[in-house]
Amino acid sequence: MRPVYMVSGGISKFAKARPDKTFQALCMEAYSYAVQDLGLEVGKLNELADGCVISYFSDHFARQLMAGIMAQDYLGLCPKPGHRVEGGGATGGLCFQEAW
């Protein structure tokens, strides 16, 4: 069996505040865009995925220490393996490096 990787991206609407959506709903918005970019549906990708790597910075802004697992659960990726990566300003890049 050979390794297969997904390369895609999605971003939620950027605004100073989004009182209309929870943190988890914003993650789903970005995730849905990334999945659509691949020509798949969320449910199908969740079937194909073996696990996930989540990066989130910073706990203090959302007042939530478990944001990564909350997002993973909301996206339907539990109980698949997943872990969280943080590294200050390098958090996003470290997430891609870790997933590789």
Please place each PLM-identified region on the residue numbering.
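Conserved "HGTGT" condensation-loop signature of ketosynthase/thiolase-family condensing enzymes
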Residues: 1-83
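Active-site-proximal alpha-helical scaffold in enzymes
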Residues: 87-100
